[in-house]
């Protein structure tokens, strides 16, 4: 029986843990939280931080897996790559993992390989921030170099705002570094990818719905993209170049970019892992029939994968928007689940918990996923569900 080590045992890793067990693998998980939801589904549990590369390596040396992986999380990829380098497993290199998890190293790689991307400045402290007054134009974006899920990302309209928001971005960075970069105006998309032997296979392009400035939190996704075919081909070209620039030669990739009116697609960032927000675990298989979780597991084990689509459908997810306050009741779920095409309705906060302003992805309270003949119909189903479900709140 082959052994798979999964870094993390949270809700994000649950699809991988369950799929690996379905595939007949012996599964061990690593997580600092002994109560993580995925532990009970695994065969073995190791208590260690997913961010502690040396601890993850020690676990791997003891467990001796045939493959190692993580789903939809950035920083644990460093541990995955370190183990792979040391034990000769099938993953990206540590150098690539750093480029894919440090936004400064990433955008430098884009610049070096002529990948369309924003202008940028690395800021290590407040004194360096003060030197940017005559170098940048507004609006611009300020964000941590080493975080995800929109944490610490803010749109800046003036030099005064730049100074006032520095602490917000700085405090969301693990190492204190932030990037100030060009603001890209236009629709946002992500590209869902599996790389096999250096070949970049674009499985799907995802249209995105985000909150307005300054935080740009993702509130919806749909597939396939409804952009014109010429633009889609440009998107695929930029995504391919971006993956090659950071050195992703195997496994999944999640590439984010905006379609600017003047210069076409320009990179925001990428991850050398599957996309989160249910995009790759749910939307891709619902729209294409391709099981990216299984493909990622097989890649980690060094096995051959098939990325041929077996479906041509539309899929969508929409997150609920509710009044701020303590959640009093949630009504209409049973009725909504009866709607044709609804595949899942989930809530990440319970009755009695607080709904707060959405500044990052963790602030969202739940979502609906739908499947239909095309993306537009899938979106309509999601919006209908949002009308039926009533989430009552009371002021705190």
Give the positions of each predicted feature.
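Short, well-ordered beta-strand elements within core beta-sheets of diverse protein domains
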Residues: 154, 182, 285, 365-372
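ATP-binding N-terminal substructure of ATP-dependent carboxylate-amine bond-forming enzymes
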Residues: 1-96, 127, 305, 322, ...
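Phosphate-binding core of ATP-grasp and ATP-grasp-like enzymes
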Residues: 169-177, 182-225, 233-267, 271-280, ...
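Glycine-rich phosphate/pyrophosphate-binding beta-alpha loops
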Residues: 150, 271-287, 351
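A structural supersecondary motif
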Residues: 266-267, 338-354
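Short beta-strand-to-loop capping motifs
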Residues: 157-158, 193, 320-323, 368-373
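Active-site nucleotide/adenylate-binding loops and adjacent lid/helix of ATP-dependent enzymes
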Residues: 5, 101-179, 185, 197, ...
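A glycine-rich beta-turn/hairpin centered on an aromatic-Pro dipeptide
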Residues: 304-341
């Amino acid at each position: 029986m082959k052994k798979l080590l999964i870094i993390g045992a949270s809700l994000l890793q649950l699809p991988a843990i369950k799929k690996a067990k379905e595939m007949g693998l012996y599964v061990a998980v690593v997580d600092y939280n002994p109560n993580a939801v995925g532990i009970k589904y695994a065969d073995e549990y190791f208590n260690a931080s997913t961010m502690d590369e040396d601890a993850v390596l020690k676990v791997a040396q003891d467990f001796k897996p045939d493959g190692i992986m993580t789903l939809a999380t950035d920083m644990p990829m460093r541990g995955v790559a370190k183990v792979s380098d040391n034990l000769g497993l099938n993953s990206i290199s540590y150098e690539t993992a750093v480029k894919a998890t440090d936004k400064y190293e990433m955008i430098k790689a884009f610049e070096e390989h002529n990948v369309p991307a924003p202008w940028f400045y690395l800021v290590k402290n407040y004194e360096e921030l003060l030197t940017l007054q005559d170098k940048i134009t507004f609006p611009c974006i300020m964000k941590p170099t080493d975080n995800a899920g929109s944490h610490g990302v803010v749109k800046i309209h003036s030099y005064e705002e730049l100074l006032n928001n520095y602490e917000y971005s700085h405090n969301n960075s693990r190492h204190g570094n932030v990037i100030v970069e060009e603001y890209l105006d236009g629709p946002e998309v992500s590209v869902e990818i599996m790389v096999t032997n250096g070949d970049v296979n674009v499985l799907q392009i995802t249209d995105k719905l985000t909150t307005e400035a300054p935080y740009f939190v993702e509130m919806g996704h749909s597939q396939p993209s409804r952009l014109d075919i010429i633009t889609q081909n440009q998107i695929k070209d930029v995504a391919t170049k971006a993956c090659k620039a950071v050195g992703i030669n195997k496994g999944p990739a999640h590439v984010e970019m905006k379609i600017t009116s003047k210069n076409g697609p320009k990179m925001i960032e990428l991850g050398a892992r599957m996309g989160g927000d249910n995009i790759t675990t749910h939307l891709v298989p619902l729209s294409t029939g391709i099981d990216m979780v299984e493909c990622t597991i097989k890649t980690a084990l060094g096995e051959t994968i098939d990325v041929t689509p077996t479906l041509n459908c539309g899929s969508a997810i929409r997150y609920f928007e509710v009044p701020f306050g303590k959640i009093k009741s949630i009504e209409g779920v049973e009725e909504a689940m009866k709607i044709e095409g609804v595949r899942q309705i989930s809530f990440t906060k319970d009755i009695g918990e607080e709904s707060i302003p959405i500044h990052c992805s963790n602030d969202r309270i739940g979502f609906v996923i739908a499947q239909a003949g095309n993306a537009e119909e899938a979106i309509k189903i999601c919006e209908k569900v949002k009308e039926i479900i009533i989430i009552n709140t009371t002021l705190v």
